[in-house]
Amino acid sequence: MKLLEGKTVLVTGASTGIGRAAAIGAAQHGADVAINYAHSDGPAQSCVAEIEALGQRAIAVKGDVADPQTAQDFVAKAVETFGKVDVMVSNAGICPFHAFLDMPVDVVERTFKVNLHGAYFMVQAAAQQMVRQGHGGSIVAVSSISALVGGEYQTHYTPTKAGVHSLMQSTAIALGKHGIRCNSVLPGTILTEINKDDLADQEKREYMEARTPLGRLGAPEDLAGPIVFLASDMAAYVTGAALLVDGGMYVNLQ
């Protein structure tokens, strides 16, 4: 059963990591996919090729989500190519680890612009298009377990992910009358580009694995299923929800 048959799905930050897994997962479930990416062309084009190999259409649109115009351009290009927007997966994010007391101003500002402002304007642009279309839609934002817990070297990052979580709650209310559902996924420790240097520390990695009841760290593909589910009509009565995808880490307090 393909959960997204005939849908058009947009995914930000999709050349690698969770975004890439979500884009490919959507294609596996029958969707055409537009991906946003900010840096290297190679990984983005290989993602497009992988989606096309599944028999679906795909485009890659380069742009920095910190610029509000990027959101408008991304949605417009998707509509030009596919004719509509059914699902937005707002995933793009950064986390340059740094101590709190000497945190550079530019690191704080860049993190907020990418993670929170970028999510806001992508969600808004997609919602505007969905309202124009008149047949509802689904928005899934990638927040983090860090929306619920702190991190010594993430004082600039955790507020942005709490903000994304809150954004989905508020937009669920604002957009419900238009038939647009808004939900978030909260990944735990997932092996991606964002934390590969941090988890290169074997002692740190083993500690995080031990904290996880399922006994392993997550892979990007572990997020694809939950994202596809929330995007699909299987979740037609789910909005304003937050789904932890963390191997049980959050509940392991002892």
Curated annotation (Swiss-Prot):
NADP(+) binds at G13, S15, I18, D64, V65, N91, Y157, K161, I190. One of its GO terms (biological process) is fatty acid biosynthetic process. Its EC number is 1.1.1.378. GO terms for molecular function: nucleotide binding; oxidoreductase activity, acting on the CH-OH group of donors, NAD or NADP as acceptor; quinone binding. Pathway: Carbohydrate degradation; L-rhamnose degradation. SUPFAM superfamilies: NAD(P)-binding Rossmann-fold domains (SSF51735). It is an enzyme of class 1 (oxidoreductase). Pfam families: adh_short_C2 (PF13561). It catalyses: L-rhamnofuranose + NAD(+) = L-rhamnono-1,4-lactone + NADH + H(+); L-rhamnofuranose + NADP(+) = L-rhamnono-1,4-lactone + NADPH + H(+). Keywords: NAD, NADP, Nucleotide-binding, Oxidoreductase, Rhamnose metabolism. The active site is at S144, Y157, K161. It comes from the Bacteria. Beta-L-rhamnose binds at S144, S146, Q154, Y157, T189, N195. NAD(P)-dependent dehydrogenase that catalyzes the oxidation of L-rhamnose to L-rhamnono-1,4-lactone. Also shows high activity with L-lyxose and low activity with L-mannose. Can utilize either NAD(+) or NADP(+), with a slight preference for NADP(+). Catalyzes the first step in an alternative pathway for rhamnose utilization that does not involve phosphorylated intermediates. Belongs to the short-chain dehydrogenases/reductases (SDR) family. This is L-rhamnose 1-dehydrogenase (NAD(P)(+)). The lineage of its organism: Bacteria, Pseudomonadati, Pseudomonadota, Alphaproteobacteria, Sphingomonadales.
